[in-house]
Amino acid sequence: MEFILSLIGSLLLIICVLVSVAFLTLLERKVLGYIQIRKGPNKVGLMGIPQPFCDAIKLFTKEQTYPLLSNYLSYYISPIFSLFLSLFVWMCMPFFVKLYSFNLGGLFFLCCTSLGVYTVMVAGWSSNSNYALLGGLRAVAQTISYEVSLALIGFKILLFSLL
């Protein structure tokens, strides 16, 4: 029973994160509209509030294209896996309600963010294009260099908080 409740809590957390991202993109579009002295997205519904959901429907109904010589399965699985990894990062965030309580939350965060590097590399490799592979390898090198500095800063904060 406790497992089912934690699973429901996790699903609610992920749904809330995805809905908040949708409305933050709506806010971004509205602010950009006001900055450029034009109205933002206001054609759908009341003040454009259903606009993110209409955008999601539009994206899911678009025609799926893929490179002719690509590895089809890994080409489509790698972005999905990257999305799931970014959603798993939210599981280690501390909340008032104990969703998942484990002592190594910082290490879990670093592991999930570092696994996201492999999805970029697999996406570049599976397209069977030299340019996409080079772009993927450049993104991997850049992400790894940023993760090293992020881990060092995090460990420094942890070390100084214990003193």
Curated annotation (Swiss-Prot):
UniProt xrefs under Pfam families: NADHdh
Major localization listed first in the record, in broad terms: mitochondrion
GO MF entry, a single one: NADH dehydrogenase (ubiquinone) activity
Membrane topology: Multi-pass membrane protein
Top-level EC class as recorded in UniProt: translocase
Location within or outside the cell: Mitochondrion inner membrane
Entry-linked InterPro entries: NADH_UbQ_OxRdtase_su1/FPO (IPR001694), NADH_UbQ_OxRdtase_su1_CS (IPR018086)
Residue stretches spanning the membrane: 3-23, 77-97, 104-124, 143-163
Electron transport is among the record's keywords: yes
Entry EC no(s): 7.1.1.2
Highest taxon in the source lineage: Eukaryota
Record carries keyword Glycoprotein: no
UniProt keyword terms in alphabetical order: Electron transport, Membrane, Mitochondrion, Mitochondrion inner membrane, NAD, Respiratory chain, Translocase, Transmembrane, Transmembrane helix, Transport, Ubiquinone
Gene Ontology cellular-component annotations: mitochondrial inner membrane
Biological processes, Gene Ontology terms: aerobic respiration
Function of the protein: Core subunit of the mitochondrial membrane respiratory chain NADH dehydrogenase (Complex I) that is believed to belong to the minimal assembly required for catalysis. Complex I functions in the transfer of electrons from NADH to the respiratory chain. The immediate electron acceptor for the enzyme is believed to be ubiquinone.
Family: Belongs to the complex I subunit 1 family.
Name listed for the protein in its UniProt record: NADH-ubiquinone oxidoreductase chain 1
Source organism: Drosophila madeirensis
Lineage, highest ranks first: Eukaryota, Metazoa, Ecdysozoa, Arthropoda, Hexapoda
Underlying gene: mt:ND1
